[in-house]
Amino acid sequence: MTTTIVLASPNYAANESKFATSLAKFQANSTDASHQRDIHMIDRIAGNLASLTVNAYDRGLLFLDESTTLEEIKAILPKLFAAVHPGAALSVDGVFAKELADAFERESLLAGWMIESKGPFVLRRPAQVEAVPLKLSTKKSAGASVGVKLDFLFKKPEKQNTLSKNDVLKAAQEEEEGEDDLYDEDALVSDEETQLGKDVLAPPSTCSKPGKKKRCKNCTCGQREQDEAEAAAASAAAPKAVKLTDTMEIDFTELLKSKNAVSSCGSCYLGDAFRCSGCPYIGLPAFKPGEQVLISENRDKLSWMADDL
């Protein structure tokens, strides 16, 4: 009896007439009268919702359509490879998406399949090949041992030093003459040039050390004035705090318009629970986008427009 594992995409199996015709076509090619099929959906096998028995099937059928994704192909090809017997074939039927044609061939090879045909695809699991042990000879040939012995017999003597006394004295004189040609680097620079370099490179004694933020009281390098100018500019650019008294009222409408209050999160109209800590609408009740809201809190009525939301 021939056992067949069938994997089909849900869309392919939904067309019952097409699915039955494809199964009958592949069954007609089988020479075995008795036939057993196990049918599974691709998405369930790829999602590990169902499993396949290892080495349990004589052949495999794979029905794909354009809805099949590359992730599903990567997941099912190794599982089909393990489910069929060594030497079994996997026939593929259906229409591929254009970008999956080359990907299917690559993933088939990575899963271990051999590609027998590409139109349509027919894959085959390679048959198992038993390993044959090889006996390695440990005997040494006579020529090899003789060669080793001859190598020691005809070893070349080491080269000895044959320099005469005259050559040694001549080399010593040349070395002394070469030392006389060296120059003292300190002699190349005068004392005035050395003192000038120290004055240029040394920082002023009254200046602060690098990285120190606080300047000296008697700073003469201009850093103190520069820091004061930067601090004054920063304080001028900072918004001034509004001071309120018991008899003073503030118009929220003018404040919101002067600051160009614009909602960046889009949730300001929902109320304080949905507003960030820096929201210009903090303290105001919820309102509808674009709606004019009037509030009375025992003082003059305040109004504003939420057109910027």
Swiss-Prot record:
Residues 265-279 are annotated as: Fe-S binding site B. Residues 207-221 are annotated as: Fe-S binding site A. One of its GO terms (biological process) is iron-sulfur cluster assembly. Residues 1-132 are annotated as: N-terminal SAM-like domain. One of its GO terms (molecular function) is 4 iron, 4 sulfur cluster binding. GO terms for cellular component: cytoplasm; mitochondrial intermembrane space. Its cofactor is [2Fe-2S] cluster; [4Fe-4S] cluster. InterPro entries: Anamorsin, CIAPIN1, Dre2_N. A motif (Cx2C motif 1) lies at residues 265-268. A motif (Cx2C motif 2) lies at residues 276-279. It comes from the Eukaryota. Its main location: cytoplasm. Pfam families: CIAPIN1, DRE2_N. Keywords: 2Fe-2S, 4Fe-4S, Cytoplasm, Iron, Iron-sulfur, Metal-binding, Mitochondrion. It is found in: Cytoplasm; Mitochondrion intermembrane space. The keyword Transmembrane helix does not apply. Residues 133-195 are annotated as: Linker. [4Fe-4S] cluster binds at C265, C268, C276, C279. [2Fe-2S] cluster binds at C207, C216, C219, C221. Monomer. Interacts with TAH18. Interacts with MIA40. Component of the cytosolic iron-sulfur (Fe-S) protein assembly (CIA) machinery required for the maturation of extramitochondrial Fe-S proteins. Part of an electron transfer chain functioning in an early step of cytosolic Fe-S biogenesis, facilitating the de novo assembly of a [4Fe-4S] cluster on the scaffold complex CFD1-NBP35. Electrons are transferred to DRE2 from NADPH via the FAD- and FMN-containing protein TAH18. The C-terminal domain binds 2 Fe-S clusters but is otherwise mostly in an intrinsically disordered conformation. The N-terminal domain has structural similarity with S-adenosyl-L-methionine-dependent methyltransferases, but does not bind S-adenosyl-L-methionine. It is required for correct assembly of the 2 Fe-S clusters. Belongs to the anamorsin family. This is Fe-S cluster assembly protein dre2. It comes from Schizosaccharomyces japonicus (strain yFS275 / FY16936) (Fission yeast).
